[in-house]
Swiss-Prot record:
Additional notes on this entry: This NAD-dependent bifunctional enzyme has very different kinetic properties than the larger NADP-dependent trifunctional enzyme and is unique in that it requires formation of an enzyme-magnesium complex to allow binding of NAD.
The protein's assembly and partners: Homodimer.
Disulfide topology: none
Residues holding NAD(+): 200-202, 233
Cross-linked residues, Glycyl lysine isopeptide (Lys-Gly) (interchain with G-Cter in SUMO2): 50
Subcellular location: Mitochondrion
Protein's name according to its UniProt entry: Bifunctional methylenetetrahydrofolate dehydrogenase/cyclohydrolase, mitochondrial
Sites of N6-acetyllysine modification: 50
């Protein structure tokens, strides 16, 4: 029992260290004379995290363990998905993680895809596994996400990982919400007792962001201790404005260009833009990537702001790499085994 307790304690400390980001906080300053917000470079923060992962990977391999391996399943030929997958495999190579991309046609049946996932789940060479979303309409995305083994689920979409996150337990955190969390913590933006508005309630992004920010900072999986309001597509714009005007932190993950404008936020607020929208540039008539926030207008009033591109996007990829090394170390599996062992010992003693 003493050994089981020690291992469980060690596992908890490892995951809390990886997921809290508390050691990397910097002081939060809002200058009274600043004319514009500090633009947070997600690329620079992502490089910091990838350097940490790179060091962790090399230490893991130097200790006699096999190099971590990430398998990515890409269904169809969606250009955006192809670009995202390429970014992930490049990031894996940069931190010393082996990776493979398994290409399947859009015509693949749901059964065939589930069989492939099962095969990868049972492959001991595969540490991390993700299926790039979105999937063709004839395939149930929720069924696919739940088919991935929870301890290989580097996207953090499996219902077990979602449930553990909601219970403030250590789990594979969804990469984008975790990236937002790391931006906030590493920039030194305070959350304890602060008002936060999250625009967007998707189960993969908006909801987990709100969960990370409002939960108890003293729990197994530390949260932000903030007061969080979530808006969605049925929230009237004027009602949203009432909430954002009081918010210390505004996070937009709605997928609506110019949803958040300067008149909606208070002076010095931190604004995190998770939105990814492709629009036609009114000047060049070429495709342009923008977020949900009127960047030029809001940065004149906010204290901190993330750009699109170059903000949350690079952090998402970096957190995927973090999840992959966690998966390789079988941290969650070890914790689960110790819990089961403790239960078995308890039953035996009775």
């Amino acid at each position: 029992m003493a050994a089981a307790s020690f291992i469980t304690s060690l596992v908890t400390r490892l995951l809390r260290s990886a997921q809290s980001g508390r050691l990397h906080q910097r002081p939060f300053h809002l200058s009274a004379v600043r004319n514009e917000a500090v633009v947070i470079s997600g690329r620079k923060l992502a490089e910091q995290i990838k350097q940490e992962v790179r060091q962790e990977v090399e230490e893991w391999v130097a200790s006699g363990n096999k190099r971590p391996h990430l398998s990515v399943v890409l269904v169809g030929e969606n250009p955006a998905s192809q670009s995202y997958v390429l970014n992930k495999t490049r990031a894996a190579a940069s931190v010393g993680i082996n990776s493979e991309t398994i290409l399947k046609p859009a015509s693949i049946s749901e059964e065939e895809l589930l069989n492939l996932i099962n095969k990868l789940n049972n492959d001991d060479n595969v540490d991390g596994l993700l299926v790039q979303l979105p999937l063709p309409e004839h395939i149930d995305e929720r069924k696919v996400c739940n088919a991935v083994s929870p301890d290989k689920d580097v996207d953090g979409f499996h219902v077990i990982n979602v449930g553990r996150m909601c219970l403030d337990q250590c789990s594979m955190l969804p990469a984008t919400p975790w990236g937002v969390w790391e931006i906030i913590k590493r920039t030194g933006i305070p959350t304890l007792g602060k008002n936060v508005v999250v625009a967007g309630r998707s189960k993969n992004v908006g909801m987990p962001i709100a969960m990370l920010l409002h939960t108890d900072g003293a729990h197994e999986r530390p949260g932000g201790d903030a007061t969080v309001t979530i808006s969605h597509r049925y929230t009237p714009k004027e009602e949203l404005k009432k909430h954002t005007a009081l918010a210390d932190i505004v996070i937009s993950a709605a997928g609506i260009p110019n949803l958040i404008t300067a008149d909606m936020i208070k002076e010095g607020a931190a604004v995190i833009d998770v939105g990814i929208n492709r629009i036609q540039d009114p000047i060049t008539a070429k495709p342009k990537l923008v977020g949900d926030v009127d960047f030029e207008g809001v940065k004149k009033k906010a204290g901190y702001i993330t750009p699109v591109p170059g903000g949350v996007g690079p952090m998402t990829v970096a957190m995927l790499m973090k999840n992959t090394i966690i998966a390789a170390k079988k941290v969650l599996r070890l914790e689960e085994q110790e819990v089961l062992k403790s239960k078995e010992l308890g039953v035996a003693s009775n």
